[in-house]
């Protein structure tokens, strides 16, 4: 909530051009902490979701032009040093969040939001033509809503440098299909250069209503091995990111690092999903992609090598109980290391099993992730 407009510009009636109308201190510290972690920033201009009985900020601004001017001053603070600010070159600026979640995020109809987006995005882009202005972080991918947004941008000349949306599902196929649908629709609407940002996503195999209202159900959905943080979620995570390598998506942002939806518990102990992200991150040390293939929809492989010729392989097995026979050509199998992520092991070494020159991966849980780091080339 520290990035919310009302946190920085607390008095909506104040002068938008007066530096004293802005309070940046906490937001400055928050973003500085993110940058110290080496994280690039995507700044959401708007307000946070309101789960309270009353709604305080999830309403359309009274003056769209003034609201855009406030955003411009915030961008100036972080990119141009205005008002004791910084030169951080934050490139991505997202307008609003989940406007189709009407009660919690936008207490007006969607058509009014789209009009608001057109006014604000165009005004910001005129001032900062080199920045990426986009949004609006729809709750899910809805082709009709996307076409409405694209039509308004074409009508007004407003930018749609990136289109963002969210997704919570346990369906890998749907996660891979969404970017393809978004790309097709945007191309048809005349926006072939618009980036695709699925910038809030997570494995979710529960019932939303029960999850929000039944405490025991919610606890089980969070703690179980087939729940939000368990081995199924971990294998889902690596399966999705593997599949995205062959699709049109520009950026995917996993939700999130902290507590309930995150990769650590309240004691900072990592969940299974942490180790899945770690394995995928380690694979990026081998950036030259190598060809892989699988004859099973629920088993996905991703391989790469480094400039020295050493390779690595990530194997994601989502709800698969059958052993996997893996042939690896041109590799020295005698020195192979195999790490396994399952219900018991957290990306820890296990003894490789070979049969007829193939590596045999035997599932030990409903889902598994294996990582083979630093596979040396054969002689």
Residue ranges and their predicted role:
Residues 202-300, 307-308:
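Aromatic/acidic polysaccharide-binding cleft in carbohydrate-active enzymes
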Residues 43, 95, 135, 198, ...:
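Structural beta-sheet core signal
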Residues 109-237, 247:
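Noncatalytic carbohydrate-binding groove/subsite architecture in carbohydrate-active enzymes
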């Amino acid at each position: 909530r520290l990035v919310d407009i009302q946190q920085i510009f607390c008095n909506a009636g104040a002068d938008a051009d007066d530096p004293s109308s802005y309070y940046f201190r906490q937001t400055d510290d928050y973003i500085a902490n993110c940058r110290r972690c080496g994280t690039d920033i995507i700044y959401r201009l708007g307000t946070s979701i309101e789960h309270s009985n009353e709604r305080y900020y999830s309403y359309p601004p009274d003056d769209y032009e003034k609201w855009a001017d406030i955003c411009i001053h915030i961008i100036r603070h972080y990119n141009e040093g205005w008002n004791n600010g910084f030169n951080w070159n934050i490139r991505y600026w997202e307008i609003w969040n989940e406007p189709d979640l009407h009660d919690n995020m936008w207490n007006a109809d969607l058509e009014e939001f789209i009009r608001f987006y057109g006014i604000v995005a165009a005004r910001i882009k005129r001032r900062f033509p080199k920045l990426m202005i986009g949004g609006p972080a729809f709750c899910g991918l809805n082709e009709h809503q996307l076409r409405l947004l694209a039509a308004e941008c074409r009508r007004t000349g407003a930018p749609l440098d990136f289109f963002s949306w969210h997704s919570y599902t346990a369906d890998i196929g749907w996660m891979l299909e969404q970017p393809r649908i978004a790309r097709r629709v945007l191309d048809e609407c005349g926006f072939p250069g618009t980036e695709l940002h699925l910038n809030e996503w997570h494995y979710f195999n529960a019932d939303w209503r029960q999850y929000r209202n039944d405490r025991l159900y919610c606890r089980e959905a969070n703690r179980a091995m087939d729940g939000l943080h368990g081995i199924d979620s971990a294998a889902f995570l690596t399966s999705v990111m593997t599949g995205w390598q062959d699709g049109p998506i520009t950026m995917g942002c996993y939700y999130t690092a902290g507590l309930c939806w995150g990769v650590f518990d309240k004691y900072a102990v990592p969940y299974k999903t942490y180790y899945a992200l770690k394995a995928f991150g380690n694979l990026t040390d081998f950036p030259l992609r190598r060809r892989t293939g699988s004859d099973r929809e629920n088993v996905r492989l991703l391989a790469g090598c480094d400039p020295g010729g050493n390779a690595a392989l990530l194997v994601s097995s989502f709800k698969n109980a059958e052993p996997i026979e893996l042939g690896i050509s041109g590799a020295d199998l005698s020195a192979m290391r195999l790490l396994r992520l399952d219900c018991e092991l957290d990306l820890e070494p296990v003894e490789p099993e070979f049969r007829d020159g193939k590596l045999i991966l035997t599932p030990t849980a409903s889902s598994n992730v294996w990582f083979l780091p630093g596979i040396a080339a054969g002689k």
